[in-house]
A protein has these predicted regions:
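A general nucleic-acid interaction/assembly signal
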Residues: 42, 130-241, 278-279
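Hydrophobic/aromatic-lined pockets within catalytic cores
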Residues: 84, 112, 116-120, 154-157, ...
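Short, glycine-/Ser/Thr-/acidic-enriched flexible segments
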Residues: 60, 200, 249
Length: 279
């Protein structure tokens, strides 16, 4: 990959406040807007521009953050509306400048479709945006803009569009085997842990685990989503790859008990995640 220069401006001098991001050679502009600072951008010229935006926050999902993806011809007015009628979000990431209404409609459709396919976040959009047809040249501009969206969201720590590695492409496989459970997975660069399809998990949960909150809720959720399906009287099977926030969240779900994922997951040589990654 080639070197990329990214400029970040703090217009209020506050690292926790509004940020404006630009990339060398790119005509677009990104605004990072904490919800409590929304009205501080009212007087900026760009607040009247067309934009695609992402609202991030915590929802009911114990694993994944929630996101709403939208577009608007005048983005500030739309965010004001969301400030009144959407409770979950705490930060808005807005991409504007260098795009028109047709571009942002195209980008909204592409963003929602890809986010749902990757499935790292709880997508709040109720309606699938219609695809907006562009000319060949407009599409090229929009696709270039979308690459910058993916880059900047990644730089900001939002993995919405980060590809999930396939098992055959992973060089470091870790295994966790316990009573009635045998799972394989790998640690991602984000600190998340993916458990691969075909792994098994123990059905029976320990008494102390049941009395907890996050572990049982997580297991109940992935069972309800049919990610974990009953294989026999003792075991579930993962019917697809699943990303957990941490190695321990993954091992807890596999074992039906509290565990330390950094020592539970071992490579083919028997070394733990802790030995390979933290020492």
């Amino acid at each position: 990959m080639s070197t990329i220069g990214i400029n970040i401006l703090l217009p209020e001098g506050d690292p926790n406040g509004i940020k404006i991001i630009e990339i060398s050679g790119w005509k677009g502009k990104t605004f990072v807007i904490p919800r409590g600072k929304l009205k501080n951008i009212k007087e900026r010229e760009e607040s009247n521009y067309p934009a695609i935006y992402f609202l991030f926050g915590d929802g009911d999902d114990p694993i994944r953050q929630k996101v709403y993806i939208g577009e608007s011809e005048v983005f500030y007015n739309r965010l004001l509306n969301h400030n009144d009628n959407k409770d979950f979000w705490n930060i808005a990431i807005v991409f504007t400048s260098g795009v028109n209404r047709a571009h942002v409609k195209y980008l909204e459709n592409k963003s929602v479709a890809l986010a749902k396919k990757i499935n790292r976040y709880d997508i709040s959009n109720q309606v699938e945006p219609l695809e907006n047809r562009l000319s060949e040249f407009e599409r090229a501009d929009a696709e270039n803009f979308f690459e910058k969206i993916k880059l900047i969201l990644g730089v900001l720590g939002f993995t919405l569009f980060q590809d999930i590695p396939q098992r055959q492409d992973v060089s470091e496989i870790y295994r966790f085997k316990t009573n009635n459970a045998d799972a394989s997975g790998t640690l991602l660069d984000t600190g998340e842990f993916i458990v691969f399809k075909g792994s098994t998990a123990r059905i029976k949960e320990t008494e102390s685990f049941v009395k907890g909150i996050s572990g049982p809720n997580l297991r109940a959720k992935i069972i309800a989503e049919s990610v974990l399906q009953r294989q026999n009287v003792d075991s579930f099977v993962f019917v697809k790859d699943y990303i957990f926030r941490s190695p321990s969240a993954a091992s807890d779900a596999v074992a039906g008990r509290s565990s330390n994922g950094w020592t539970a997951w071992r490579d083919l040589a028997g070394k733990t995640l802790d030995e390979n990654k933290r020492r």
